[in-house]
Amino acid sequence: MLWMVWVFLLKPVIVFSIAYILFRLAGKKAVSQMNNFDLLLTFAIGTIISEPILTSKLPMSIYYAGAFLVLYLIMSKLSLSNKWRWLLVVSPTVLIRNGDIDERGLRKERLTVNELLGKLREKGYADPADIDLAIIEETGEVSVIPKEEARAVQVRDLNMEAERNFIPIPLILDGEILDHNLKYLQKNRSWLFEKLEEKGYSPKLLSSIILGTMNARGDISLDLNTANEPQHDPYLYKPGNNN
């Protein structure tokens, strides 16, 4: 009887752990980036691995899920070869070419003109005439290449040199110091505390800092969870009765 209780309690944990391991082995992709093989694997493993929760066929389910994973990895490997890719992966479909909507492409992908216009608006374009090329990728995502006169102005168009992008490095997150980032910068906590004191913040108030980052100049920017916003500012208005 005790054994039955343990099986009942541990089976969901085992099933979840196995499913997690299988999906980690399959690789990481967002749902929007999945092709047909990725979706097939997701549904198949989800269905197969959930069966042991209702039945006692855990070993058989693990075997079938593992077999699906092996087949998926083989097919994914083959899809990297130009010889097999045309057979295994759906080719992109042209939806707009030189500002003209391709009706055959829309019919093939079962898209309406309204849906296509919505996809363009998501990319920041309202008029198909501004589009040089729009294609639907194998993942279902629509890629848009605007005409030269419709694209956003680039720095090189102004004969200017752009500074290299710098991603602010988080040093404090939710009141906790990220020591691994300090180590990466060859800094220590004493240096960070000095920077905080320069800004008028005591290390004792560390818990009130939601985010602290270092920019390219070495300056520290802080975002506190105690907002100190001016009242009755029209720019801070929000709909509702909580103003």
Swiss-Prot record:
Transmembrane segments: 3-23, 34-54, 58-78
GO-annotated cellular components: plasma membrane
Gene knockout outcome: Non-essential, it can be disrupted.
Record-linked InterPro entries: DUF421, UPF0702_alpha/beta_dom_sf, YetF_N
UniProt keyword list: Cell membrane, Membrane, Transmembrane, Transmembrane helix
Subcellular location(s) per record: Cell membrane
Domain of life: Bacteria
Pfam short name (any one): YetF_N
Family per record: Belongs to the UPF0702 family.
Protein name: UPF0702 transmembrane protein YkjA
Protein source organism: Bacillus subtilis (strain 168)
